[in-house]
């Protein structure tokens, strides 16, 4: 058999892609490992949207679902109805759907995927294809094709925390009990199995009434991040905020905050921490471009990644993974593939104008971001004196340094001056170090109101910036904070103390011996405990010191400082993922 388009994955993006391509008259082969369509939207029990509503074909499908529900009673509610609608629409337009199908090989010639082999149980099948679309989430097809992949944060390769989702009974519908459950390597069958069993404990409750009766585990764990393709255009957080991202050929726009679930923030990138910690900007929702070249793996002519594995970096991946955005890129990828198949050409040879004409593209909403990111000097000055200084701090990066320094020199100690100190610290300005030290020493408790949630106290934000500026004068006081188990905001201060000490040690090799001694006192003492609340839960606390000890041990190894942290790790109640991290550390 020969098909115009192969779609691997019939989930949130893949189901929309299959319907869109089949409607255009393309012959479509869908390979889905599960037994139903919709992915996270259906089997994941998350039928809704985050901040951005559906658009285009996805909105059309949702309208069909609502109409079907209004006509009668359906067991399972929207999630089950949506399965029926998606399958019906794909079949109605002639798509071939193979459930329980696992791709095992692809044929690649001159940068084009020309054939696929898959298994259904023990039976082997194959087909020739003209265009290919990877909508698996984990880049299964791209892996088989030999695409270059990246993923995880730069410091240690870790992905975002995942969710062990359970189906629960709502008042009038079926919903999801959707709590963070720590980190997991979903590519390891052993770790995935152990992790899913262990993290069921997050659902233990004293009361299962009030719409919280648990019905079943989700078929699909809430995996927020895996690998990303290295694409023809990699969309990065740095390029987005600097304005250097090419937005001339977009297939749509996503609206979201940079929705991180990480609670070990000191190991994220500097830019990411500047946004989240330095300016308390977690809740700031922005418009992001979805460039078409970010869908194409570098060097390939007819292959696209239309799922969360598409070409973005770890930092922006926190925002560009939501259901609405996945529907948008699924529809766009299908339209693009059909045009390329009809022209018998490579994807990038299809004129952008032809593709754009087929898409429900709105006028660019990107200028709306300016109200948060491009305040003028007067608004910056006013904002720095207020309760929501984050927008002014970020916007200040566009103002002349000399202007900010003159404001700083003229100002008395005040909220304005302290917020301005953070703005200048974003530029590595050493003149603010004395004030940062004072805020840290005072444990300044002021919390801004920039974000709707997760604002950060000035005291430990100052500690973050002291590490960012590699202030070697405060090594001993920072060490005292790390080892003090009775302090308020113990987790926040201790975690950022570790981050600061590691940064200072990287910048000042002559201080590594002393810093190493402090870090060893923490990491070799099994009674040093760090607890953090899992996001999405009211009171579920997770012990985090194991992960921090592992990072400290890795760094001390790199510095050539002997330690006995491995012996301490053997005594701790590490979770499944930490054990694997510890094993890899020992194997180095």
Residue ranges and their predicted role:
Residues 20, 26-27, 32-109, 150, ...:
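Conserved N-terminal/central alpha/beta ligand/cofactor-binding core
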Residues 19, 23, 332-342, 502-506, ...:
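Short glycine/serine- and small hydrophobic-enriched flexible loop segments
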Residues 40, 119-120, 124-131, 135-385, ...:
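Flavin (FAD/FMN)-binding glycine-rich loop and adjacent Rossmann-like elements that form
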Residues 1-13:
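Beta1/beta-strand and adjacent pyrophosphate-binding region of the FAD-binding site
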Residues 110-116:
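Short, hydrophobic/aromatic-rich segments at coil-to-beta transitions
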Residues 368-378, 397-410, 429-450, 471-485, ...:
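Amphipathic alpha-helical scaffolding segments comprising HEAT/armadillo-like alpha-solenoid repeats
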Residues 385-398, 406, 410, 415-430, ...:
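Structural detector for internal amphipathic alpha-helices that build alpha-solenoid repeat scaffolds
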Residues 9-12, 49, 74-77, 317-325, ...:
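Alpha-helix capping and helix-loop boundary segments enriched in small/acidic/polar residues
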């Amino acid at each position: 058999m020969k098909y115009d388009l192969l779609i691997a994955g019939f989930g949130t993006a893949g189901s929309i892609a299959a319907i869109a391509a089949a409607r255009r008259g393309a012959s479509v082969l869908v390979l889905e490992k599960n037994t139903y369509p919709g992915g996270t939207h259906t089997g994941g029990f998350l039928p809704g949207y985050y901040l951005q509503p559906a658009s285009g074909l996805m909105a059309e499908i949702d309208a069909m679902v609502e109409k079907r529900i209004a006509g009668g009673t359906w067991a399972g509610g929207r999630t089950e109805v949506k399965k029926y609608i998606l399958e019906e629409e794909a079949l109605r337009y002639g798509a071939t759907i193979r459930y329980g199908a696992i791709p095992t090989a692809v044929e690649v010639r001159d940068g084009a995927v020309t054939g696929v082999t898959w298994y259904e149980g023990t039976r082997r099948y194959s087909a020739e294809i003209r265009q290919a679309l990877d909508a698996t989430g984990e880049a299964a097809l791209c892996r088989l094709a030999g695409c270059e992949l990246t993923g995880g944060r730069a410091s240690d390769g870790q992905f975002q925390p995942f969710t062990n989702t359970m189906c629960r009974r709502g008042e009038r519908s079926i919903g999801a009990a959707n709590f963070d459950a720590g980190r997991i390597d979903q590519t390891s069958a052993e770790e995935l199995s152990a992790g899913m069993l262990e993290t069921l404990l997050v659902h233990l409750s004293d009361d299962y009434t009030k719409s919280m009766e648990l019905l079943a585990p989700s078929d699909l764990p809430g995996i927020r991040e895996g690998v990303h393709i290295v694409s023809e255009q990699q969309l990065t957080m740095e390029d987005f905020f600097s304005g250097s991202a090419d937005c001339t050929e977009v297939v749509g726009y996503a609206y979201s905050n940079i929705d991180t679930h990480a609670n070990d923030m000191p190991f994220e990138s500097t830019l990411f921490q500047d946004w989240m910690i330095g300016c308390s900007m977690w809740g700031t929702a922005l418009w992001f471009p979805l460039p078409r070249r970010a869908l194409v793996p570098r060097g390939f002519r007819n292959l696209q990644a239309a799922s969360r594995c598409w070409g973005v970096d770890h930092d922006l991946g926190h925002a560009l993974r939501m259901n609405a955005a996945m529907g948008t890129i699924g529809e766009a990828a299908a339209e693009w593939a059909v045009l390329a198949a009809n022209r018998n050409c490579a994807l990038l040879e299809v004129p952008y104008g032809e593709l754009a004409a087929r898409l429900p593209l709105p006028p660019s909403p990107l200028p709306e971001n300016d109200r948060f990111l491009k305040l003028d000097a007067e608004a910056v000055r006013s904002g720095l004196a207020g309760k929501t200084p984050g927008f002014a701090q970020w916007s200040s990066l566009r103002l002349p340094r000399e202007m900010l320094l003159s404001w700083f020199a003229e100002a008395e100690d005040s909220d304005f001056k302290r917020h301005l100190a953070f703005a200048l610290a974003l530029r590595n300005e050493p003149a603010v170090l004395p004030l940062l030290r004072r805020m840290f020493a005072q444990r300044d408790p002021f919390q801004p109101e920039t974000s709707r949630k997760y604002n950060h106290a000035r005291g430990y934000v100052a500690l973050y910036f002291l590490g960012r500026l590699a202030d070697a004068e405060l090594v001993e006081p920072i060490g005292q904070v790390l080892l003090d188990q009775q302090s308020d905001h113990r987790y926040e201060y201790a975690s950022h103390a570790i981050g600061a000490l590691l940064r200072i040690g990287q910048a000042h090799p002559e201080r590594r011996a002393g810093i190493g001694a402090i870090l060893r006192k923490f990491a070799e003492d099994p009674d040093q405990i760090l607890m953090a609340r899992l996001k999405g839960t009211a009171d579920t606390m997770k012990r985090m010191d194991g992960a921090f000890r592992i990072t400290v041990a890795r760094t001390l190894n790199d510095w050539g400082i002997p330690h006995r942290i491995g012996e301490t790790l053997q005594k701790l109640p590490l979770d499944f993922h930490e054990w694997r991290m510890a094993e890899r550390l020992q194997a180095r």
